[in-house]
Amino acid sequence: MIATAKIVGYDGEVLIVKPLATIEQELLQKQVDEIEIRLTDGREISANQRRKVFALVRDISSWCGEEPEYIRKFTTFEYCITKGVETFSLSDCDMSTAREYISYLIDFCFRHGVPTRDTLLNRTDDISVYLYSCLAHRRCAVCNKQADVHHIQTVGMGRDRTKINHSGMEAIALCREHHREAHTRGQAFFDKYHIYGIKLDDNLCKILNLRKDR
């Protein structure tokens, strides 16, 4: 089960929380002795976040033909099931939940090939998660067209990309057009679009079929 609680004390080692609903029966029946804690920032969803959510919902609605309200409810439910969190309202959820939900909607668009009215770079509320998703789905971080992996550190002349360890290297997903622009303009390119390379972890290396030593 998922329960919400209020923090009532913390001394640096011991955290005391007060559940907002009675959970005694569940604790006794399941003999729970360990819990998972998810911290939120305490601030409510911003108007800008809400605009991003509804813009993404409208894009998905236009793509599949369902009403926006149905899409909002469906994606909210799927997000909560996937993340294992309580249902929430866009009227008063916290900013952390809104941020993660926006990232989920963006990933949904990438997974299903949903065409969007604007680049998802302008819709993201968490640039690092967005850049990771762009790499995972091979979508350009700038325009969202089909992309290749652009290494921030050059691999080097004469080196076989299939034989080097890519794990830990910084990379970004860019289409051919923006790949050329990145090579031509260098750091000015990244400053222009407010993007950057992220480190390839083992999961990304596996998804992208890049060699890793471990």
What is each stretch, according to the model?
Residues 74-118:
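Charged, alpha-helical interface segments at or near domain boundaries
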Residues 139-171, 187-188:
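Histidine-centered nuclease catalytic patch
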Residues 2-20, 34, 155, 195-214:
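Phospho-dense, intrinsically disordered low-complexity tracts enriched in Ser/Pro and acidic residues
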Residues 118-130, 153-161:
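Short Cys/His-rich Zn2+-coordinating modules
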Residues 1-85:
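General detector of N-terminal leader/presequence modules that precede the first folded domain
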Residues 45, 89-97, 128-131, 162-166:
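Conserved aromatic-histidine-acidic binding/catalytic patches
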Residues 163-169, 180-214:
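Polybasic, low-complexity binding patches
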